[in-house]
């Protein structure tokens, strides 16, 4: 091998769920490229098990009935021993939120939420030894107010006023910003000594390593594949 020739950089990061990072090539004095970040899953919106979060807590123990309950809505009909309840309040219940009678006796949990944001119903999975034929039409069902989310969480955000400008900062040499949950990668990375950094990949930890890192991996949705790695570091003579 000849000492006068520095070795070239590494390959680009691949597209995919995890977003593999491209390693920078090793040369005499050139550091390997950093790992491309994996793209996260897209956040869920609206109803249908996307919005509102699942469950009332992770691995929570049964703490008994809540201090108070408020009306959620009225029982409308049953389907395979599940209840369908027309919701009468604006706030949105958690999935798996416990449902009670007025005397705080638990009868089941929220299973599905369906309809529009302003007009929706829920299905209730009944507890063991509780049967749908024991409920009367239009019977009130109740919920712990601590298991509700404000409706504003599910409404579109108001547009920004015209003329509002985003602040601009000029950081030389900064790596490309990681894309959002479904967005494209950030601008071109500045890179350190040696080759220039590749484009930043969509994901959390993409970015160039020292001495010409490879591009970050593609994000979960529509992220760009990582760019080719920069040239290796300076060769020794």
UniProtKB/Swiss-Prot annotation:
| Assembly | Component of the box H/ACA small nucleolar ribonucleoprotein (H/ACA snoRNP) complex consisting of Nop60B, Gar1, NPH2 and Nop10, and associated with H/ACA-type snoRNAs.
Q: Provide the protein's localization.
A: Nucleus, Nucleolus
Return the GO cellular component terms, semicolon-separated: box H/ACA snoRNP complex; nucleolus; nucleoplasm; sno(s)RNA-containing ribonucleoprotein complex
Q: Could you give a single Gene Ontology term from the biological process aspect?
A: snoRNA guided rRNA pseudouridine synthesis
**Residue segments, region RGG-box 2:** 166-236
RGG-box 1 as annotated region, ranges: 4-56
Membership in a protein family: Belongs to the GAR1 family.
Here the segments flagged for biased composition (Gly residues) are: 1-59, 172-237
Observed effect of gene inactivation: RNAi-mediated knockdown in female germline cells results in a cyst differentiation defect that prevents progression from the 8-cell cyst stage and oocyte differentiation.
Role, per record: Component of the box H/ACA small nucleolar ribonucleoprotein (H/ACA snoRNP) complex, which catalyzes pseudouridylation of rRNA. This involves the isomerization of uridine such that the ribose is subsequently attached to C5, instead of the normal N1. Pseudouridine ('psi') residues may serve to stabilize the conformation of rRNAs. Required for ribosome biogenesis. H/ACA snoRNP complex-dependent ribosome biogenesis is important in female germline cell differentiation during oogenesis.
Please report the name of this protein according to its UniProt entry: H/ACA ribonucleoprotein complex subunit 1
- Region annotation Disordered: residue ranges? 1-64, 157-237
Q: What is its main location?
A: nucleus
Q: What is the lineage of its organism?
A: Eukaryota, Metazoa, Ecdysozoa, Arthropoda, Hexapoda
UniProt KW keywords: Nucleus, Repeat, Ribonucleoprotein, Ribosome biogenesis, RNA-binding, rRNA processing
Q: Does the keyword Nucleus apply?
A: yes
Q: Which GO terms describe its molecular function?
A: box H/ACA snoRNA binding
Listed InterPro entries: Gar1/Naf1_Cbf5-bd_sf, H/ACA_rnp_Gar1/Naf1, Transl_B-barrel_sf
